[in-house]
From Swiss-Prot:
Name of the featured protein: Small ribosomal subunit protein uS17A
Keywords from the named record: Acetylation, Cytoplasm, Isopeptide bond, Ribonucleoprotein, Ribosomal protein, RNA-binding, rRNA-binding, Ubl conjugation
Source species of the chain: Saccharomyces cerevisiae (strain ATCC 204508 / S288c) (Baker's yeast)
Family: Belongs to the universal ribosomal protein uS17 family.
Subunit structure: Component of the small ribosomal subunit (SSU). Mature yeast ribosomes consist of a small (40S) and a large (60S) subunit. The 40S small subunit contains 1 molecule of ribosomal RNA (18S rRNA) and 33 different proteins (encoded by 57 genes). The large 60S subunit contains 3 rRNA molecules (25S, 5.8S and 5S rRNA) and 46 different proteins (encoded by 81 genes).
Domain of life from the UniProt record: Eukaryota
Gene name for this UniProt entry: RPS11A
Post-translation changes: N-terminally acetylated by acetyltransferase NatA.
Annotated localization: Cytoplasm
Purpose of the protein: Component of the ribosome, a large ribonucleoprotein complex responsible for the synthesis of proteins in the cell. The small ribosomal subunit (SSU) binds messenger RNAs (mRNAs) and translates the encoded message by selecting cognate aminoacyl-transfer RNA (tRNA) molecules. The large subunit (LSU) contains the ribosomal catalytic site termed the peptidyl transferase center (PTC), which catalyzes the formation of peptide bonds, thereby polymerizing the amino acids delivered by tRNAs into a polypeptide chain.
GO biological process: maturation of SSU-rRNA from tricistronic rRNA transcript (SSU-rRNA, 5.8S rRNA, LSU-rRNA); ribosomal small subunit assembly; translation
Amino acid sequence: MSTELTVQSERAFQKQPHIFNNPKVKTSKRTKRWYKNAGLGFKTPKTAIEGSYIDKKCPFTGLVSIRGKILTGTVVSTKMHRTIVIRRAYLHYIPKYNRYEKRHKNVPVHVSPAFRVQVGDIVTVGQCRPISKTVRFNVVKVSAAAGKANKQFAKF
């Protein structure tokens, strides 16, 4: 019952489309759940298959497909609801001085409840349709933080 309350935290009743949850039929303990393979060699997490969350923007249980660019970055902020900010560092060449300078871009990314993401984790994201005004990417894989070497410049 407690998991049901956490799933139903919005005003509207949250359910997966085309899945009919008939309360009168008692066939099995397992609830019906729709999930898919995101493709491109990314595995569907167990929490997406066995979980009870409802997220229409999830690449595994929602109506969003991954296509286009695949990027990697480090998580710098998890303050938004189901959205994180990743930092992508790169080197820019300055011809006058024949040297490189460090630059970075912050990219807002939608994160499914199937993943537990913390600041410092390295995530792989895939491009999808525009989810909001700024969000165009979705987390497809999470790697643990590299360790205490986060002050060093890492090229992805």
